[in-house]
Every structure is written in structure tokens, then in C-alpha cells.
């Protein structure tokens, strides 16, 4: 019976959010021809509430025009968490968009991950971003946690290709100034 299939479908997802399971079930069962609006709504809800890049791919593939896909990218940047945004923009190779996003989100926990994805494409811009982050941290105070954060960012700066000389100069400035 249909009820039995629904029960079987949900039985192996008991540990997860029931709403998410229901939405995933509805996405699988919606007829794209007759229920395209419902399908889009359910797919959008999955992406923006649960932040799974696979949901982005599904939703993107439902879009029929480039303008719709561009609008979806804008929505992703405003509604998804930074980790998901990083994954999606990287997978889509939207490096300029990811760089702009990183510039606006330097205080995010995932900022180093964004830079790792970008550093081969924009080494100078990534180095400059890190320079600003480290300088701001140095000027914000003292303390062990602050020192650990600065050291972590400095290690990331050191790994940006082609910036070895600039890194050495910046570290010399840091030692002289602070």
C-alpha cells in the first residue's frame, strides 16, 4: 500500500528531522510537469533550511534560464551558511563571487576555508585580505586566544602561493610594530 511505502521510506530516517524527511519525500514524489511550483518550493526549503549542496544542484537543475540560476546564487549567498556558500560557489567555479563573499565575511569561522579555495585563483587578493584580518586582530587587544587566532591566520597566509616574500615582509612589520 501507499501508506506502507511511506512508512518504509521514513523508517531509516528516524534520527533526522521529520520535516526534512517529509520534504525529501515530497521532492521525490512531486510530478515536475504538474507540480513544478510545489517542487521548487520544497527544493528551496530544503536548500535554505538544511544547507546541503546536493539540494542546490537539484534546485539549480530545475531552473530553466541563466537569470534564474544567477538569482539562485544570490539567494544562496544571503540565506545559506558560509560553509555551504563556499562549497557551492567553489563547485560552480564562481571565484569572483566567492572572493567578494570572503571580503564580507572575514570574521566567519569558515574564512580560512574560503581562502584555501581562492588562493590559487587570487593569491594577492587573498594575502591582502589576511593582512587586514591579522592587522585588525593585532590592533584589537592582547590575550592567548587572540594570539592563537593571529598565529592560525599567519600560517594560512604563509601557505598562499607566490606570496612568500610578502609574507616575510609582513611578519617583519608585525614584529617591529607590535
Where are these regions (language model features)?
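Eukaryote-biased, non-catalytic alpha-solenoid scaffold regions
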Residues: 1-178
Amino acid at each position: 500500500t501507499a501508506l506502507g511505502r511511506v512508512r518504509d521510506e521514513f523508517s531509516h530516517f528516524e534520527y533526522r528531522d521529520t520535516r526534512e524527511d517529509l520534504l525529501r519525500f515530497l521532492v521525490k514524489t512531486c510530478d515536475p510537469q504538474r507540480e513544478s511550483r510545489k517542487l521548487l518550493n520544497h527544493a528551496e526549503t530544503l536548500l535554505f533550511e538544511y544547507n546541503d549542496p546536493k539540494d542546490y544542484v537539484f534546485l539549480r537543475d530545475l531552473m530553466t534560464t541563466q537569470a534564474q540560476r544567477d538569482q539562485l546564487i544570490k539567494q544562496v549567498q544571503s540565506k545559506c551558511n558560509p560553509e555551504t556558500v563556499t562549497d557551492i560557489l567553489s563547485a560552480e567555479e564562481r571565484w569572483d563571487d566567492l572572493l567578494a563573499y570572503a571580503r564580507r565575511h572575514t570574521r566567519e569561522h569558515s574564512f580560512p576555508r574560503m581562502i584555501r579555495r581562492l588562493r590559487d585563483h587570487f593569491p594577492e587578493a587573498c594575502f591582502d585580505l589576511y593582512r587586514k584580518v591579522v592587522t585588525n586582530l593585532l590592533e584589537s587587544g592582547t590575550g592567548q586566544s587572540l594570539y592563537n587566532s593571529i598565529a592560525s591566520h599567519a600560517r594560512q597566509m604563509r601557505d598562499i602561493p607566490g606570496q612568500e616574500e610578502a609574507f616575510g615582509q609582513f611578519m617583519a612589520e608585525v614584529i617591529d610594530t607590535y
